[in-house]
Amino acid sequence: MVKKALKKNSNNVTGPYDSLRHYMEAIETHGNVIRIKEIDQDAYELTGFIYKLLDKHGWLGAPSVIVEKIKISGEWVDGPIIINQYGMAGHEAMAIGVPLDEIKKGEHLHNYKKALNKMMEMGDITPIETTEIDKADAPSKDVILKEDEINILDFPFIQTNPGDNGRFINTGNLITVDPEQGRNVGTYRMQIKGPRKIG
């Protein structure tokens, strides 16, 4: 079942946001989210659906998609799975405070300048002091798994295409620390190679 989210109100809901949940709620408020109750990825239904969206709306016009339940390797797995959350023109600019109705689809230079001007209005970008809060009040780490409790295969990551060599974390944010080389932060497509191994 596919349902296009209805525009909840006409107010501009702009960032910055406290969490990915708040960001997705703002996108949904603008009617730019399609919710899918369940889909069979063993038959590559999600892959086909996303390609059809891109064909119809283009790379910068396709809405975000939230899948509530998905079939992976013969089993139905609860989501949500979020796809294309940053793909639609204007969403990233909206996240830094540019109202979505000021974003012009297809006018990338205009949109870039609009977002850049908004960043400049914010002044110098300086490091934010670390604030320590009690673990019970943390907005993340609702579930903490350690050592053998960790099983990446429990998460609804999918094999996106038939030619893939397995399931992948697509556009995952990866932070690594090397004792000699230091820290690296990047966005990568990472293959899941086991319960506690990605590469």
Language-model regions, residue ranges each:
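Extended, highly charged
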Residues: 2-199
